């Protein structure tokens, strides 16, 4: 259920009837499957790094395993890689894994984070 008490389906349907393009921010392959079943126009891996640590060993970089699985399962659905894209190499890896597009956020909008990444790498 949504904060307004509606099912996602009940929110999505009227928007689709009006021709609105819909993107689903997803955490898991199950989320992507559900978005596909509901007819979302595209999905992103934005929330994949929000999984509990026990479910993922991802610490850095985009969730390429989820991206690859989604691209394989849904070859006609645009999959956007979003989240933890810190370097041009991360973006290239996402495109090579089949991403339809890549979103670079914090790496270009938050200098404090970028500085901490460099410091951590140099302290190793």
Q: Where on the chain are the PLM-derived regions?
A:
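Active-site-adjacent beta->alpha loops and helix N-cap segments on the catalytic face
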Residues: 1-15, 29-34, 51-71, 88-92, ...
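Alpha-helix C-cap/termination motif
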Residues: 17-18, 38, 73-74, 97, ...
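Catalytic cores of alpha/beta
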Residues: 28-39, 81, 85-104
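Non-cysteine beta-strand/loop elements that form the S-adenosyl-L-methionine
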Residues: 41-48
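Charged C-terminal helix
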Residues: 124
């Amino acid at each position: 259920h949504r904060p307004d008490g509606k099912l996602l389906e009940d929110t999505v349907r009227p928007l689709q009837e009006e021709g609105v393009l819909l993107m689903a921010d997803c955490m898991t392959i199950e989320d992507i499957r559900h978005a596909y079943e509901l007819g979302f126009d595209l999905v992103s891996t934005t929330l994949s790094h929000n999984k509990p640590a026990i479910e993922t060993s991802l610490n850095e970089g985009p969730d390429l395993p989820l991206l690859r699985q989604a691209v394989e399962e849904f070859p006609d659905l645009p999959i956007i890689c979003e989240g933890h894209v810190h370097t041009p190499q991360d973006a290239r890896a996402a495109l090579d894994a089949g991403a339809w597009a890549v979103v670079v956020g914090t790496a270009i909008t938050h200098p404090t984070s970028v500085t901490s990444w460099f410091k951590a790498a140099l302290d190793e």
